[in-house]
């Protein structure tokens, strides 16, 4: 893959392997570089360390390549230079997929080179026209064969049946054998061209191939490596510790309601509910889950697509019931209040986050090492924020919903455990 170059830039040819992570075998995503110099996906390295599968001599944060591990756990930060290189590689790959591979830099003093890009649709249409012309040429060639006689048999390329023709052209005649072979070759070429033409026509937008042809076309047409479809979401290491917590009705505020399976919490559309008074009930739009997490590692996911303003996190059971999640010394969360208003709160300290709305949020809690991490979950998990947690009492999954948006809801996903 050639990097797009301009001015005095030097073109560099790279393959996907040059920018891949040995843990997930894919392109680096949010690359991070260890003190030893080796780079990995930030998420992959974090998950590997969490699972302790890469531990060396009791050190869980050893490098997966050189096996070197510092005395203290290094902080993982995105390598912006390496990320920029990956982004440029992906840009060049998209240009190739669109039908125009970037040209190498011109030699010194040479005239500027202009690359005309063509879309995939235009290329397919041009190929279709070329094949159609070839089919017409072959059919024309087929009708211009040597004249061996007249009649329907002659038109089909078979020997004449009259006695005089048999004398002139026996089955052992070299001329007749040569003609029969040529005729057979032409028929094969014509058949192959018509098949290619049919497949190309099926590839043009608006002319989808029949359903029964899809599998055949997939197996017969070879795609370049850069034209592969995106890989499906890889199984996360975090799913090994998956749980599906349920909401605790004792903590539910008066303007919220919970579904029958206790995994969906909704802002009420009508008047406040007349729940029984409880000292555990929140006075603002918040709710805890029943599960008290005190040891080990836990992971759960929350669907946020139907909620415009929300906060997701953990807190100790002793959190004040009139306190906001993240604004107390015993609660931590990420909070979405709209585009450009995404933040993390940890022990009353706010950190602005730069990210689009995560439709599904994954929460990772490692109570052994005191770590909390939030992920945007799609094809892959993308780390949003991580922090240290410390509490002398168990922690509970905790949620806030904007109380003036009736019908908005958050839903805890049922994960396979």
Curated annotation (Swiss-Prot):
Self-association and partners: Homodimer. Interacts (homodimer) with RIGI (double-stranded RNA-bound oligomeric form); involved in both RIGI ubiquitination, oligomerization into filaments associated with viral RNAs and the bridging of these filaments. Interacts with UBE2D3 and UBE2N; E2 ubiquitin ligases involved in RNF135-mediated ubiquitination of RIGI and activation of the RIG-I signaling pathway. Interacts with PCBP2.
**Which terms does the record give in the GO molecular function aspect?**
ribonucleoprotein complex binding; RIG-I binding; ubiquitin protein ligase activity; ubiquitin-protein transferase activity; zinc ion binding
Disulfide connectivity for this sequence is: none
GO BP, one example? protein polyubiquitination
Q: Name one GO cellular component term.
A: cytoplasm
CDD domains hit by this protein: SPRY_PRY_RNF135 (cd12902)
Q: Which organism is it from?
A: Mus musculus
Q: In which tissues is it expressed?
A: Ubiquitously expressed.
Q: What stretch or stretches form a coiled coil here?
A: 121-145, 180-204
Pathway(s): Protein modification; protein ubiquitination
Q: What is its main location?
A: cytoplasm
Name the reaction it catalyses: S-ubiquitinyl-[E2 ubiquitin-conjugating enzyme]-L-cysteine + [acceptor protein]-L-lysine = [E2 ubiquitin-conjugating enzyme]-L-cysteine + N(6)-ubiquitinyl-[acceptor protein]-L-lysine
- Disruption-associated phenotype: Mice lacking Rnf135 develop and breed normally. They are susceptible to RNA viruses infection.
Localization annotation: Cytoplasm; Cytoplasm, Stress granule
Give the main EC class. transferase
Q: Which protein, by its recorded name, is this? A: E3 ubiquitin-protein ligase RNF135
